[in-house]
Amino acid sequence: FADHSLEANLRAIGKEFKKAREIAPEGVIGFNIMVATKNYAMYVKEAIKAGADIIISGAGLPVSLPAYLAEAAAEMKSAGLGETVKTKIAPIVSSVKSAMVILKMWDRKFGRVPDLVVIEGPLAGGHLGFSRESLTELGVDTPDVEHTYHQDAYDEEIRGIIRLVGEYAEKYQTKIPVVTAGGIYSHEDVMHQIDLGADGVQVATRFVTTVECDAPEEFKQAYIRSSKEDIVITKSPVGMPGRAIHNAFLSGVGQTPFKLEHCYQCLEKCDKKTIPYCITKALVNSAEGHTEDGLVFCGSNAFRAERIETVDEVMKSLLGE
């Protein structure tokens, strides 16, 4: 990976898809691919060729995603790999404005709409589709988010996105499911989203601290050890704010000038002279269990994890069973 990142990532797409399909023969298997990634189009097309059921894409606006789907379909057809492609495509949006850009562009340029829309809110983990100022206005950049979050304001944004998606669904005489994400931890959270009009929810943080999660034990324990004061908003080289667990790594960011020793060619836009750290190196370190030397992304409720659970336990909790 270090020396041949692109080739390694392309191989990993097929490898991980095969592994997931063996675990869930009848399951829906998707890839989350960041628009900000270098070689984005190649990764999208490789996932389609691998057999992905859905591609979810954010960290930027996936305005050209339908084009890459069409290109992959044409390449597969010419190679004798089938006449049709089953892969669905879904943009991640965080505001009515970003949803409008995607829907209008896909409608005008490609004559289609998304198969699914994911609304990722300000309580999500990892990269956030909000400016730092917007996060402050929403009251989600404090340790006491449960009391400072202006939920009513963002709930109205969600309703607005759902209304907008509905207009395009009506135009195309189809159903476009809307899934909400970010800070969903309990059955009550799930039901609140359904009451807002969501067709489903996307949950990540709760599944990190499960037996089945393939993250290293030290990564899971970082969640369990964390307090709400440890969960902070940090600036990412991707150019977006991100939510993570404060640790020795983040304490050291900006303390001394950063010198890039090896470039993984991971981001389309990366100013190697000014970045505070290498995001790939930081994420790889934490994924390998070196959590004090890496970036540990998490949702706003990560501190609520008290023990390692099973996926079955988490699902029953979310469903209120």
Question: What feature does the model see in each segment?
Answer:
Residues 1-171:
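Active-site entrance/lid segments in N-terminal catalytic domains of soluble metabolic enzymes
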Residues 124-179, 185-321:
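Conserved active-site-proximal phosphate/metal-binding subdomains
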